[in-house]
Amino acid sequence: MANVTIKKGDKSFLGKEVTVEIDRPVGTHHPKHPDIVYPINYGFVPGLIAGDEEEQDVYILGIDKPLTNVVVTIVAVIERLNDNEDKWIGVPNELVGTPICYECNINKIIDFQEQFYKHTCDAIYEKTCGAVMYTELNGERLYLLIKNESGHIGFPKGHVEYGENELQTVVR
């Protein structure tokens, strides 16, 4: 099969299943920075060429034992703003949609490496916190509701930022 080149910022693989060949299993030291130890499995998708002209890299979440290869679903794209490549986040199918897939948790898990890069995390799932806000006027309770771009009406909420807890999100 011929190699396929992926453009930087491409999010078309979100939600898709890929096979990853692991070249840095859990516990492996970074080849250029031996003080960095991988707490998760890390590998690449054979045949998919990323912005660095190497095969597309994938962080594997949710499997604590060292692997050689694994089939995962891509749940997030880490776009490095000061680098020429993106990183993907993959999880086993049975973990898709669980809290490990939330943007705030992904950022915490990959911080061991991504702390050195300015980046954004585009995840399929994000943890949100909402609040029921109301006031009373003339003995009647009035609720604050918002109408989003799709026309749905709901309570105000926001996504949990990296390092925040639920209360901090609500206050913000």
Task: Give the location of each predicted region.
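Short, glycine/serine-rich, charged loops/turns that create anion-binding
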Residues: 49, 65, 136-138, 150, ...
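Short, well-structured alpha-helical interface segments that form or flank functional binding sites
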Residues: 40, 126, 169
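Short, catalytically relevant binding-site loops at active-site mouths
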Residues: 27-29, 151-152, 160-161
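Hydrophobic N-terminal alpha-helices or hydrophobic patches in metabolic proteins across all domains
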Residues: 2-122
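Alpha-helix N-cap/loop-to-helix boundary motif
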Residues: 14, 123-125, 162, 166
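The catalytic Nudix box helix
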Residues: 155-172
